[in-house]
Amino acid sequence: MKSNLRILLVLVITTIITGIIWKTQDAKGDLSSNVQADFAIADTSLVNKIFIADNQGGTALLERSEESRFWTLNGEFIARKDATDLLLKTFTRIEVKGPVNEKMRETVIRNLAGTAKKVEIYQGGDRPVKTWYVGTSTPSHTGTYMVLETPEQGMSSEPFVVSLKGSIGFLTTRFFTDITEWRYTGVFDFPGRSLAEVTVIHHETPYHSYTIKSNPKGDISLENGAGAILAIRDTIKVQDRFLHFRKVHFESFNNHLTKAGQESIRNAFPAFTMLVKGFDGRSAKFDLFWKQTDSGPDEEYMYGLTTGGEVVLVQRYVFDPLIEVLSDF
């Protein structure tokens, strides 16, 4: 009797497990063939335009440039490469975890209607190949509620829970419309061996100013502020300082200054000026100003003035090594 009970129990468990596996596989098969769940973009190299809109009226138009590795922002600015790369990565790695639970469906649809961000993805045509409606995260913060729209099928009536392959989290924060967050924060961008010359001017102590020059072979020379060539005591240190100028970013366009405060910076005399030139003829200038506090210069931040005349916030952690005095070499 006990033996028969064991056999019966094994058969029941086996049947249940087989049913679960069959049902799971069948559900996945149905989902993979469901055009309403086909969010992914197979070839992101064909994506040439992305339009993002939120429910507050904010928009961001990102367009691929044929002349640069950077995308343009609203036809006026340069977009952050890390942010556009993240979008393209999201487009290709997105996967559907499953449909929304029936009990949650109406609530999710209602929330999507009120808060979803619209993301249009273009591949050369006048109409988006796919439009995502990106909602909030799931209660567990391991997925995001989304709805798909395509020219062929229109807008899906079914919301899905999506995530990225190989990762856990939600996607909402990747799709933002704040222009200051989208704008490229690069001060200098001279990749590889394209950097030819760096000049750092210490306006308050001119004798600390210097220029480092390089030829296409990578040989460097050092000059003081008057243009006199100096002997290099530590070649590795000078080369290291020179190479630090290849890629430099400021902290933020949000400088926390009023318009009057910004104008005051523009009219002030800078503490430092950095001039950088490349072998391709490009050049860039960046001025630095002390950020004054009640106890003296701020220990963490300074103000910067871009070539285009915009006042930005910079981290001293990044820029202090770039304004070392000549005697340090």
Please provide the spans of the model-predicted regions:
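Secondary-structure "cap/kink" motif recognition
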Residues: 1-329
